Amino acid sequence: MHPLWAFLLGLSLTNGLSANCPGRCSCDSMQSVQCYRLMELPSGIPSTTKRLYISHSRIQHLQLSNFTGLLALEDFILLASGTESIENDTFKTLSTLKTLELWKNKLRQVPSALPANLEVLKLNDNAICALRGSEFEGLKNLKVLELKNNLISSLSPSMLSPLASLQSLMVDGNNIESVVGPLSLPHLKYMSMENNQLHLIPGNVFTSLQNLQFLSFSGNFLTKIPINLPKSLLSLKMERNQLKVVRFRDMKHLENLSHLYLSENFLSSIDGAQQLTNLTTLEVSQNQLQMLPPRLPSRLQKLDCSSNFIQRVTAPEFQDLRDLKHLFLDNNVVSLFEAGALQRCSQLSNLALEQNLLLSIPLRLPKTLARLDLKGNAIQDMAERELRDLKQLQVLNLRNNRISALDFKALEGLPRLRHLYLDGNPWNCTCSLLRAREVLKAKGTDVKGGQCAAPAERQGESWMSSKKILRQCEHHLQQSEKSKETKKKPKPEDSSSIRLNMDDDDDDYEID
């Protein structure tokens, strides 16, 4: 076809489509209609429409006649439109409807007589008080049910029993005080009941949930982890509850569990986690731990113990954690960090030690570290021996410490350093500090901070960018360069010692 004819044909189709599109709506060739700020559901929606999206309108009531002729409709989304009521059987004749989303409205109950082919039902942010099994009758294909942020007070088997194919259930942010079991949902994989009023979970709730993989009870009032959890579980979230103890012996059958979240509870100790042999993530931040958990699972990759009261870091807690990649110990009271405590963690890339009581950078850290956060300690020095093996380090955060000088040799030993954070330290801006600046500029490191606290005539200047300091120290830098060149110049009568010295220099850059 000639390009001109193709253009004219496309133009005519577009004009025809726009002509059939209701006001305040946009229609596209993908059979999708989007409407905004309506007072009622518009008439004249194309009969071929598969997706109808209406948002931020004032549609108080939906009725059967609104959908007459929309026999191809697959997705209907009504968002933030003030809808309070829906006529009985409004959606019943929409046999092709697969997704129904009625978010942020004022519905008090689940719409009745929903179409049998429905797969996704989302009624979040309404005013639904109760669920009745009759509302879900015939929904054998429903896979996703979301009822977040409503006013539901309880869950029972009779409410959900018609949903034989349900795979995901989310009822976060309700007023649920009780759950009655067993919930007969054999295909359920994901269940979230966050931010409710639960104090106790009966042991029989999970009897028929043998395919459940992800479970969250975060933000409730539970004092213990529910018993008889399904063996299929991969992830368990119990943050923001009232746990004081975790009985791992009641969880040892969870051989597939890989993620356990216990942050923001009242745990004073964690012991026995090694029984969860496949655990890769353990988060216990914002508890009352005074020591690191002993005997952790050997496959652990992430351990978050931030915001506790941990004082010491020693080698025994980490001797079997060869797969550990991320360790968070920030906001504790760590004052003792045993040299080489993490040497067995041969894959550790991220170590967070901000806001502790460290006086120096820990010695013999893993060579694999890419990020090291030491903000807000009492570190006074940055020595070459503390950093010499960290050839992979890319980010070093030393904000808000007591460092006044930098060893430029320590910086030379960090070939991959890309980001260095130095603000909040009392820098003594002598000319020798500019050697460190030259090293950092040569490697292209992004440096944040570095304001001089001394001497008095340089207070407030930045030793990384101040031209004034550079001019004052120009002679010192030239002398340093000449001294360096003199040391490098070989003596003909002692070539063997030169080679030896060069090898020694190379050793400074190698990883043992």
Swiss-Prot record:
SUPFAM superfamilies: L domain-like. It is found in: Secreted. Expressed at highest levels in the kidney, where it is primarily detected in the epithelial cells of distal tubules and collecting ducts, and more weakly in proximal epithelial cells. Expressed at lower levels in heart and lung (at protein level). Detected in skeletal muscle. Residues 1-19 form the signal peptide. Residues 474-484 have a biased composition (Basic and acidic residues). It comes from the Eukaryota. N-glycosylated. Its main location: secreted. GO terms for cellular component: extracellular matrix; extracellular space; interstitial matrix. It holds the Pfam family LRR_4. LRR repeats lie at residues 45-69, 71-93, 94-117, 119-138, 139-162, 164-185, 186-208, 210-232, 234-253, 254-276, 277-299, 301-320, 321-344, 346-371, 373-389, 390-413, 415-442. GO terms for biological process: extracellular matrix organization; negative regulation of transcription by RNA polymerase II; negative regulation of transforming growth factor beta receptor signaling pathway. Keywords: Glycoprotein, Leucine-rich repeat, Repeat, Secreted, Signal. Residues 503-512 have a biased composition (Acidic residues). PANTHER family: ANTIGEN BSP, PUTATIVE-RELATED (PTHR24369), INSULIN LIKE GROWTH FACTOR BINDING PROTEIN ACID LABILE SUBUNIT (PTHR24369:SF213). Belongs to the small leucine-rich proteoglycan (SLRP) family. This is Nephrocan.
